[in-house]
Amino acid sequence: MEVSPFYEKQIECIHCKKHFPTFKVRSKNIRVMSTASDFQPVYSDTQVHAYFYNVLVCEHCGFSFTEDFTKYFAPGTTELISAQITSKWVNHTFNGERSAEKALEAYKLAYLCAVLKKEKHIVIAGLLLRLTWLYRELKNEAQEKRFMKMALDQYMESFSNEDYARTQMSDERVMYLIAELSRRLEDYQTATRFFSRVIERQRNTLEPKIIDMAKEQWEILRETRNQTAQQ
């Protein structure tokens, strides 16, 4: 009998402390074929998108979060979430397989909860980047660009106050994303500046792959700017 790529896991809500079930993808079924220049994974099995399941939606109170959220709630935020989310929540579950549309709904809930909870800019940026990927999956270019710009703004804020310290995000990775999202949004000046800053670190980095990606995108950017200048 074929084993499902999904398994059910019990999660404790960090807001209401109740437990709820959610689907997760078995690690052996996560097969990334390639990665886009903004880190969107391309899976060999198009039916199994692991990042669709990153958001945990509490069926009891509606609070939606990822493993990147802290368990700390700043004073007043618990009450704000109860008023803005829980009081309007109609009990329903996000357990089960998720389509791109269902994942989009979950990520939008998580984004709202992150803003109300006053999560770090780096966490909010990650949610917005994945919303960008989802709209790309759905071939909605206008919304893809909209959320890309929102993600870029949050990465800029995070870089300015270094709130990504002690996370899995390095200086190089944050600067690279600022550069690449700027390039995609045709802000070539910002893209040039930040790609340069990443490449400058090539002799003293723990992220050689990011340096290589920055060089590749720098070349694409240079060609684009040359073509634009010739028009």
Language model features with spans:
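Amphipathic alpha-helical repeat scaffolds of TPR domains
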Residues: E79-F94, E101-L109, L116-N140, S170-R184, ...
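Flexible helix-coil transition and linker loops at the boundaries of alpha-helical arrays
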Residues: N95-G96, A110-I124, E157-Q168, R203-E207
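Structural signature of alpha-solenoid helical repeat junctions
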Residues: V123, Q143, F147-M150, D163-D171, ...
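Alpha-helical solenoid repeat scaffolds, predominantly canonical TPR units
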Residues: A106-L109, C113, F147, Q154, ...
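N-terminal cysteine/histidine-rich coordination modules
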Residues: M1-L80
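TPR/TPR-like (Sel1-like) alpha-helical repeat modules
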Residues: L152-M156, Y188-L206
